[in-house]
Amino acid sequence: EMTSSLVGSEMCIRDRRSRAQQKANANVVFVDENIFPQTLAVMTTRAVPQGIELRVGKYKEFEPSQEVFACVLQYPNSNGSVEDYTEFTEKAHAADCKVAVAADILSLALLTPPGEWGADVVFGSSQRFGIPMFYGGPSAAFFATKDDYKRTIPGRIIGISKDAYGHPAYRLALQTREQHIKREKATSNICTAQALLATMAGFYAVYHGAEGLRNIAGRIHSTAGFLAKELEKLGYTQLNKDYFDTLKIQLPAHVSVNALREIALECKVNLRYFEAGQVGVSIDETTLPTDIGVLLYIFAGAAGKDYMLDESIPAQTYFDAKFARTSDFLQQDVFKKYHTETELMRYITRLGRKDVSCLLYTSPSPRDSTSS
């Protein structure tokens, strides 16, 4: 995700600036202050040699100018809040400014995808699609853009054609790396292959399909909402009006952050501690009711109260209906067939025998982190 953020910005500056922006040598990227800190850190490092200036600020206060050619947003943002960027995107486009969005891929099973509210580039990590944390990495990114920009996408693009017998066959459709064309025209020379991780994430989507992903995302969201309601009963305030899986919690005046941290450490629970004194909690598909009980025990203990989890977690939506996804996704046949372990393993074996795999290098393979 961190690498993709700058790749998206570079794509926007390459052949995608208006004539007025090129004449003004527009080189500024606006970055919302609530982007993930690790993403901003990588962008800051990589922007310098690319001649790109980063301006960090509040997206609601952003005013487009001729020198700004792209904007980068987080959806949901670093605090966990789901923001309505529709008006912002319209304002940016009116000034010939492209909009790139770092998105949580699993949240998009429930939330309106950025492409539907006008984003030009959408990127992020595919780690949530069945990839363990691996102590922080590696994981493959996903990168999507409009069809108009396909020739400025970094990396190689695999397409489907027909062989001499009229059968479907995969081939390299676009070859924009420096191995194939002049270096000055190349869009990428990155070669840190994450093909295995991308393949694993892809099979996760194949196994679960659209309905399975909706159920997983719905369970995560319902658990986060239940936790928020129970915390409010203990006197805490949840600051995110709309959210998917992450809460930003304001502590009551009589609750000490240090006391909360000590209890959390005793319970071997990691929380996010903001400089202003708030606490962040994120839920994922591995979170069990017992984990919620432990979290509520921690917050209750810090508040000097007792708590016992004695009810099930109901399925419920806690964000505004305007954010709800209404469009279908993963409608191809492959996402509807292989929903048992046996079916999936047989499918993987068939693909391996056709060499649509990483076992041999006879089939076209991008072998590129940016094209996975």
Q: For each predicted feature, which ranges?
A:
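Conserved PLP-binding catalytic core of the aspartate aminotransferase-like
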Residues: 221, 234-264, 283-287, 367
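Flexible inter-domain linker/hinge segments
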Residues: 291-360
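Active-site C-terminal subdomain of aminotransferase-like
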Residues: 129-230, 234, 239-241
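Flexible, glycine-rich loop/tail regions that form catalytic "lids" or insertion modules at the edges
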Residues: 221-228, 251, 261, 317, ...
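Noncatalytic alpha-helical scaffolds and linker/capping helices
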Residues: 278-288, 295-297
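Single conserved hydrophobic/aromatic residue that forms the stacking wall/gate
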Residues: 1-13, 361-371
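Flexible, glycine/charged-enriched surface loops at secondary-structure junctions
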Residues: 54-57, 212-217, 231-242, 272-275, ...
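Conserved PLP-enzyme active-site core in the AAT-like
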Residues: 15-169, 231, 244, 248-249, ...
